[in-house]
Amino acid sequence: MVLTIDIGNTTIGIGGFQGNKLLFIEKISSRRPLSDAGYRKKLNMILNKHGLSAEAFEGSVISSVVPSVTAVFSSALEAFLGQKPLLLTHELDLGYEICTEFPEKVGCDRLADIAGAISRYPLPLITIDLGTATTFNVLDENRRFLGGLILPGVGTAHRALLGKTAQLPKGDIHMPAHTIGANTQECITGGMLLGNACAIDGLIRHIQTELGQKATVVATGGYATTVIPHCETKIHIDQNL
């Protein structure tokens, strides 16, 4: 088995794979970094929960967009499993060619999204990751990663709006019964969800126009199941990219 670690701006995803089969996935916060010992304790608790031990894993892989957490977690993982984890970077053979400017600056989360999707979906391909940021990644029919788009995530935009206004009510993001909100809370949540859904539809159209052909579209991330059902475009939701 292989232990995979996805260190994002909000959460750390910890998954166990047997070949291409995901056996389990757990998430912990990345906003409150732990010590080396703290992460080892978390890893031990997660494996115990699933009836596993460190000896069951032949290796590990880390994808991270939070450098300050990467070093500590990498050290904890090496001590826990007895071997260094493989760090996902643009220098690895990921099954596609990176054709962007400054490949070394492309987020590992974006590289991982494409690598996960390319083995499951036909090309050309657009991946959309709805997390702290919403990222679009475009792969053409020749397995070339051309680039993409980045915009504020749903939760990030929601917090920014509430943080900059004095009288807007706080609340969870969910789709109200009607597009035209009957109160301020419905106006905010409907605007957030439908606004993002329409933005996604529009950006997909622009990308496909520039590509000159239709593309398979795959969405993942914490807000995918909340936003994507309100899109008009056919989009596959895959939470295990």
Where do the language-model regions lie?
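Short beta-strand-loop/turn "lid" adjacent to the catalytic site in phosphate-handling enzymes
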Residues: 52-105, 142-148, 153-154, 182-193, ...
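Glycine-rich phosphate-binding loop plus the immediately following alpha-helix
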Residues: 31-38, 106-108, 113-122, 146-192
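A generic secondary-structure signal
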Residues: 45-50, 116, 120, 203-207
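Short, well-ordered alpha-helices that flank and scaffold nucleotide-derived cofactor binding pockets
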Residues: 18, 45, 75, 79, ...
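Glycine-rich phosphate-binding loop signature in dinucleotide/nucleotide-binding domains
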Residues: 50-55, 120-122, 210-213
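Gly/Thr-rich phosphate-binding beta-strand-loop-beta motif of the actin/hexokinase/Hsp70
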Residues: 1-24, 117, 123-145, 161
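ATP-binding/phosphotransfer module of carbohydrate and carboxylate kinases, centering on a glycine-rich
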Residues: 2-4, 158-241
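N-terminal glycine/serine-rich phosphate-binding loop of ATP-dependent small-molecule kinases
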Residues: 1-92
